[in-house]
Amino acid sequence: MTSSSRSLRYGIIGVGMMGCEHIRNLIAIDGCAVVAYADTNATSRSNANRLVAEATSYSDYREMLANEQLDVVVIATPNHMHRSIFEDVIECDVHVLIEKPLGINVAECQTMIEIERQHQKPGRVVWVGLEYRFMAPTSRLIDEVDSGVCGDVKMIAIREHRFPFLKKVDNWNRFSKNTGGTLVEKCCHFFDVMTLIAKSQPVSVYASGSQDVNHLDEIYDGARSDILDNAYVVVDFANGVRGMLDLSMFAEGSRNEQEICVVGSKAKIEALMPESIVRIGRRESGRQGVIETMVSQTSDVVQGFHGGASYLEHCAMQEAIKQGLESGVTLEDGLLSVAVGQAAHLSIAEKRIVLIDEILG
């Protein structure tokens, strides 16, 4: 695979909102260059050209793969296109960053894992874009938990109260058939963070949710938008840890968009974003002993849409490539994050607890 002694040459497949986010991050990192990009949408290609005019533009990613000498390919297309594009990319001698969710359902993810196994190359890094674990407050919270401050972790609560889904090219994100559903498309990030903190496998899911406020009057080509906009999801892990997600996508009037709370036998830790606050409260110290710290990325980190997390994700992946390390966010991580989301949607539909083994097959 790639030599660590030269600049990494990147090709981007899909240069909509997230693809351009990747470009902005990569042009700010030394030792790499975006040399080509591909997108079927002319407006998206024009937007990418304004960022990297020197890169070659393609309307067909297959032509880009055939014509360019690439080291890394980033797949940032709509979710339902991930699997088929991955099948083509993995046949090339390149490292791969594939955006979340890995696939729109578990079956797709399992197929992609098997395809990668069949095309394994020494030193190849295949990385899933679950970058929320790199947000500064979240990363600090994880480090504090790992240090043992909490004692034995028992409860993980994540709240995301935010704005509705943004408008995307051809409105692809208005339909669950394209996204996998809100709890896959959006919330795979949080199920990944939960699993990372719990250090255990999710075993069951119970959820309640609906589409109550957003996109109710949106109809495209005769089909009405069907993406839910609020939910509660409870996840039980094999080691006894419990996780809970509280999602509202009509809660713009919130001081923080994301709040993570981990409670253990010795302490409680909270991470608040975008306030960039981490709180640690030890049981022995009570309410008056809660310590609050401002935690933010260093000034050299490109903030972008995710508080610098996407930038740090690329830095971590490049370090893995150059040092011959394994991926920090694996296809298996991507699979589990999708499995919990898919289980949550099934739980809502059938009003019952769903075992992860049912979903994984």
Predicted regions and their residues:
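Conserved SAM-binding strand-loop segment of SAM-dependent methyltransferases
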Residues: E54-Y61
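Residues forming the Rossmann-fold NAD(P)(H) cofactor-binding site
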Residues: C20, R83, C188
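Predominantly a Rossmann-like dinucleotide-binding segment in NAD(P)-dependent oxidoreductases
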Residues: P122-R124, Y132-S225, K351
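Contiguous beta-strand/loop segments that form the cofactor/metal-binding neighborhood of enzyme cores
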Residues: F191-I277, Y311-Q323, G361
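Beta-strand-loop-alpha-helix segment that lines the small-molecule cofactor/substrate pocket
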Residues: L65-N67, V72-N79, R83-E131, G148
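Active-site loop of classical SDR/Rossmann-like NAD(P)-dependent oxidoreductases
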Residues: E21, T40, V302-H314, V329, ...
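C-terminal helix-rich "cap/oligomerization" subdomain common to oxidoreductases
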Residues: M1-S4, M17, G31, V72-V74, ...
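N-terminal Rossmann-like dinucleotide-binding module
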Residues: M1-V52
